[in-house]
């Protein structure tokens, strides 16, 4: 196994984007000999294109450069060739069946030879049709997989976010000194390298563990541990831009298109590997998981610049939430449940923060709606994201085949998740607000007596 130091060295030298000619999520038959087919996503063309009005609204509201008419024309071409292929395959199957019947009944050699020649002709025709269909299929399916999820009815489609909750009002004062001035707490080198010290280092760990414990004790979540690396097929299934994470340069790569990325264990994509091709009983739903770990997402680094700081750092400790439900209404309820727990945690810190729905233009193609948790950063004089929760509907579960069985058919699960805490940004905001980190009230924390008091109490217990 590669050490983290060598992995980061390779990651930092990798290109920001990865040019790909083949999708890891869908591989056509002509390329399956060279590349292992990891996953075959479920694609319901009739349902997708049957909701054309909502799909067009989703594309336009997100500002995506997708021409639905072009995709539909490719679909018609694909259907025509696929129908022709199916017709020849059925004819060949009938000839094969007929040949077996005549062989058993002892028919004439001439008749048997005619059927054999006809079967060979159909086999060659079928092979030629497959070779013709592969590029058509490849062109259409990859465009189809780029189509976005439908928007939630509550998702803002205009240019403004929808405010859900606000706590405290930022003080209208001059620009506050940056948290980087507190060099006894933060030694910042660049976006990829920084060191938290003393109370900042303690708060970094305690805040993460406390929030996870709060979700376990008060939200009935199960705490898990996830891998730091995710294969490309899962990023594509979640419609995550490959530039969001560092590409890992592997020395011995068996599947050249299904490369690995350094995401961190506290990433939504890190959960997907355990859920791929998984079928659960309805009785265990909803699934509620929480995870503490690292996050190496580069997507938001440019939002809070141009001056590098803890607000722009690409790595941080984080708390990740993952929930799976059977229906969309249950997913909405779980999203509200998560936000209520997160609100309690941030209210206890008593600094200005707000929760709002992000606009459609800010969503990834897989998200139907996103709730953003932001705290006020005095040095930037603006709100910065310290957490977010997204509703994905059944968009991702269809791609990774994550389902539940109900009677004689399968239902794809609705997924909700996201990081509810980025510790580095929260620390930066707290320091700039003049809050003593050791005095912060962390819901879910374990109150411990000083060691000498514990020892004294244990000594007293010996005589009681």
From Swiss-Prot:
InterPro entries for this protein: aa-tRNA-synt_IIb, aa-tRNA-synth_II/BPL/LPL, Ser-tRNA-ligase_type_1, Ser-tRNA-synth_1_N, SerRS_1_N_sf, tRNA-bd_arm
Ion transport among keywords: no
Keywords: Mitochondrion, RNA-binding, Transit peptide
GO biological process: mitochondrial seryl-tRNA aminoacylation; mitochondrial translation
SUPFAM superfamilies assigned to the protein according to its UniProt record, in alphabetical order: Class II aaRS and biotin synthetases (SSF55681), tRNA-binding arm (SSF46589)
Compartments where located: Mitochondrion
Cellular component aspect of the GO annotation: cytosol; mitochondrion; serine-tRNA ligase complex
Main localization, broad class: mitochondrion
GO MF annotation list: nucleotide binding; serine-tRNA ligase activity; tRNA binding
PANTHER family, A to Z: SERYL-TRNA SYNTHETASE (PTHR11778)
Described function: Essential protein which may play a role in mitochondrial morphogenesis and function. Has transfer RNA (tRNA)-binding activity and can bind tRNA(Ser) but does not have serine--tRNA ligase activity and does not bind ATP.
Record-stated family: Belongs to the class-II aminoacyl-tRNA synthetase family. Type-1 seryl-tRNA synthetase subfamily.
Protein name: Serine--tRNA synthetase-like protein Slimp
Organism: Drosophila melanogaster
């Amino acid at each position: 196994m590669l050490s983290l130091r060598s992995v980061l060295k390779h990651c930092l030298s990798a290109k920001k984007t990865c040019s790909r000619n083949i999708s890891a999520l869908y591989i056509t038959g002509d390329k399956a000999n060279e590349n292992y087919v990891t996953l075959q996503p479920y694609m319901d063309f009739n349902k997708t294109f049957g909701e054309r009005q909502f799909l067009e609204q989703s594309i336009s509201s997100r500002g995506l450069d997708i021409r639905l008419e072009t995709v539909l024309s490719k679909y018609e071409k694909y259907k025509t060739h696929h129908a022709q292929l199916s017709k020849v395959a059925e004819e060949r199957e009938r000839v094969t069946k007929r040949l077996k019947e005549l062989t058993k009944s002892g028919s004439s050699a001439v008749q048997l030879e005619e059927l054999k020649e006809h079967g060979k002709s159909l086999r060659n025709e079928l092979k030629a049709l497959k070779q013709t269909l592969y590029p058509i299929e490849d062109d259409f399916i990859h465009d189809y997989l780029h189509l976005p999820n439908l928007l939630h009815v509550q998702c803002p489609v205009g240019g403004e976010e929808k405010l859900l909750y606000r706590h405290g009002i930022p003080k209208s004062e001059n620009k506050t000194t940056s948290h980087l001035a507190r060099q006894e707490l933060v030694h910042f080198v660049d976006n990829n390298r920084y060191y938290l010290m003393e109370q900042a280092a303690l708060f970094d760990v305690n805040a993460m563990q406390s929030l996870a414990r709060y979700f376990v004790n008060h939200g009935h979540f199960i705490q898990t541990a996830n891998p730091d690396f995710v294969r490309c097929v899962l990023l594509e299934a979640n419609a995550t831009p490959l530039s969001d994470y560092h590409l890992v340069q592997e020395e011995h790569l068996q599947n050249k298109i299904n490369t690995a990325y350094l995401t961190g264990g506290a990433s939504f994509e890190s959960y997907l590997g355990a859920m791929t091709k998984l079928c659960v009983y309805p009785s265990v739903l909803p699934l509620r998981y929480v995870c503490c770990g690292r996050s190496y997402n580069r997507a938001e680094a440019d939002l809070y610049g141009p001056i590098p700081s803890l607000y722009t750092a690409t790595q941080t400790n984080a708390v990740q939430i993952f929930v799976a439900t059977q229906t969309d209404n249950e997913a909405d309820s779980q999203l509200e449940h998560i936000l209520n727990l997160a609100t309690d945690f941030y209210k206890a810190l008593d600094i200005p923060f707000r929760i709002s729905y992000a606009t459609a233009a800010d969503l990834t193609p897989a998200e139907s709606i996103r709730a953003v948790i932001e705290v006020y950063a005095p040095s930037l004089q603006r709100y910065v994201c310290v957490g977010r929760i997204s509703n994905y509907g059944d968009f991702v579960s269809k791609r990774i085949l994550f389902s539940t069985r109900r009677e004689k058919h399968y239902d794809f699960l609705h997924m909700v998740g996201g990081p509810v805490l980025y510790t580095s940004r929260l620390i930066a905001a707290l320091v700039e607000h003049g809050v003593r980190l050791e005095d912060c009230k962390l819901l879910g924390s374990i109150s411990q007596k000083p060691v000498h008091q514990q020892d004294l109490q244990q000594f007293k217990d010996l005589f009681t």
